[in-house]
């Protein structure tokens, strides 16, 4: 039996035990966005090391291991890499969609004037790199990879900002997070529209029916998360069979997730007041009215949080420290050769990220501010914005994902090398500039106004 005899809780707090000190620290560790970037970096280094070692053939073969099930005439067989890219990454896109909806409904994206700068800058950060890439690859085999240079990797960008600590103004952090959200949404649309196979409309219709059923369950008040995950898995199978990239299921379900809790704040207060009205004593055990009141209070506390917030808190650590490192291990491994680095596709990818991203983000942000469409957040100087724009050249996770849809074999390896090289150059350039700027940077203001 767990006791709280050694705990010294403050008034209004839950009692603690020795294990809580460890688990709470670990929970805080998991919640730090920068830590997931460090884990992702470690997985990338491991993948690159093994891919350029005597064990490279075995490492490559591992991800091609076929895995699947067969029930009668139904057969589902995929390589381990495909299961990660098409299956587990659906959870990643689900989390991205939850983040987008939370920010739009509850967060920084609620204020149109505040978000306008990020939207305009994100547009420039996608259009300019894409245009530069197409200019370099027009009529070439790599032309189909125009979507590779569009995204920004949130985890790595936040990880870089964490290295700078208090030198990073809150305005820059909000700007980059909002920009990354817009980037992610656009990248999702690119995958769904630009890199899908021929469509099986029957399978797609079955997937659409599944979404209608999920909507109906929500309207009826079904709150069992397991039921929704089971329905989501069935929809995923249908959409996967349709030819449209199945990760779009994660996006749609994430955007369909409610942002309002089932129990209102007022109702929660009433329920808690009822529980607190009981006099002290040993009357919480057994099948009693008091016990049922306590159970109702527990449910009310949980259901006051919106499904978006609960699912994000529940799944984000698993995605950040499980799915994304697995994705990096399965996809970031590529033989590093001079021939690969000077491949036209690799050079076009590097140009798009290292040059196109910062130029597009900075130029469009400046135009947005000068035309009055957008305003800069307090504390975000032009010098800081340029430094942040350099960091947006870190495409990594989404860029590798899109490259896997656009290319095969040697061209895919060249694109991966370009993505990795661009991520290194962009992170070093961005960190160097942000470190060089004074805390109250006004040096670039005169040049932009």
Curated annotation (Swiss-Prot):
It is found in: Cell inner membrane. The chain crosses the membrane at residues 32-52, 87-107, 114-134, 145-165, 174-194, 202-222, 233-253, 318-338, 347-367, 382-402, 417-437. Keywords: Antiport, Cell inner membrane, Cell membrane, Ion transport, Membrane, Plasmid, Sodium, Sodium transport, Transmembrane, Transmembrane helix, Transport. It catalyses: Na(+)(in) + 2 H(+)(out) = Na(+)(out) + 2 H(+)(in). Pfam families: Na_H_antiport_1. InterPro entries: Na/H_antiporter_dom_sf, NhaA. It is a multi-pass membrane protein. Disulfide bonds: none annotated. Its main location: membrane. GO terms for molecular function: sodium:proton antiporter activity. GO terms for cellular component: plasma membrane. The keyword Cell membrane applies. One of its GO terms (biological process) is regulation of pH. Belongs to the NhaA Na(+)/H(+) (TC 2.A.33) antiporter family. This is Na(+)/H(+) antiporter NhaA 2. The lineage of its organism: Bacteria, Pseudomonadati, Pseudomonadota, Alphaproteobacteria, Acetobacterales.
């Amino acid at each position: 039996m767990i006791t709280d005899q050694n705990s010294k809780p403050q008034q209004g707090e839950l009692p603690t035990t020795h294990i809580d000190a460890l688990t709470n620290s670990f929970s805080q560790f998991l919640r730090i966005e920068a830590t997931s970037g460090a884990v992702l970096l470690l997985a990338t280094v491991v993948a690159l090391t093994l891919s350029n070692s005597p064990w490279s053939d075995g490492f490559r073969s591992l991800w091609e291991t076929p895995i699947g099930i067969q029930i009668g005439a139904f057969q589902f067989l995929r390589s381990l890499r495909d299961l990660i890219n098409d299956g587990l990454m659906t959870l990643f896109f689900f989390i991205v969609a939850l983040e987008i909806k939370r920010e739009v409904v509850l967060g920084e994206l609620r204020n149109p004037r505040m978000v306008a700068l990020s939207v305009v800058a994100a547009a420039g950060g996608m259009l300019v790199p894409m245009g530069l890439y197409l200019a370099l690859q027009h009529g070439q085999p790599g032309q189909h990879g125009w979507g590779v240079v569009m995204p920004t990797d949130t985890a790595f960008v936040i990880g870089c900002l964490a290295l700078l600590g208090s030198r990073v103004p809150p305005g820059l952090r909000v700007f980059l997070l909002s920009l990354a959200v817009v980037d992610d949404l656009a990248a999702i649309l690119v995958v769904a529209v630009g890199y899908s196979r021929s469509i099986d409309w029957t399978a797609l219709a079955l997937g659409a029916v599944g979404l209608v059923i999920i909507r109906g369950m929500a309207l009826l008040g079904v709150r069992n998360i397991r039921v929704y995950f089971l329905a989501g898995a069935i929809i995923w199978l249908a959409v996967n069979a349709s030819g449209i990239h199945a990760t779009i299921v994660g996006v749609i379900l994430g955007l369909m997730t409610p942002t309002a809790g089932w129990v209102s704040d007022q109702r929660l207060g009433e329920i808690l007041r009822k529980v607190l009205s009981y006099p002290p004593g040993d009357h919480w055990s057994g099948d009693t009215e008091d016990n049922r009141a306590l159970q109702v209070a527990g449910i009310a506390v949980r259901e006051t949080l919106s499904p978006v917030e609960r699912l994000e808190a529940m799944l984000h650590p698993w995605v950040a420290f499980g799915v994304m490192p697995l994705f990096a291990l399965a996809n970031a491994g590529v033989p590093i050769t001079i021939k690969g680095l000077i491949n036209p596709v690799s050079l076009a990818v590097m140009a798009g990220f290292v040059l196109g991203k910062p130029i597009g983000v900075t130029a469009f942000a400046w135009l947005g501010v000068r035309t009055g469409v957008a305003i800069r957040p307090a504390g975000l100087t032009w010098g800081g914005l340029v430094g942040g724009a350099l960091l947006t050249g870190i495409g990594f996770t989404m860029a590798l994902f899109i490259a896997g849809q656009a290319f095969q074999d040697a061209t895919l390896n060249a694109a991966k090398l370009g993505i990795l090289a661009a991520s290194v150059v962009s992170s070093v350039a961005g960190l160097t500039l942000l470190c060089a700027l004074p805390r109250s940077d006004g040096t670039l203001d005169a040049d932009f106004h």
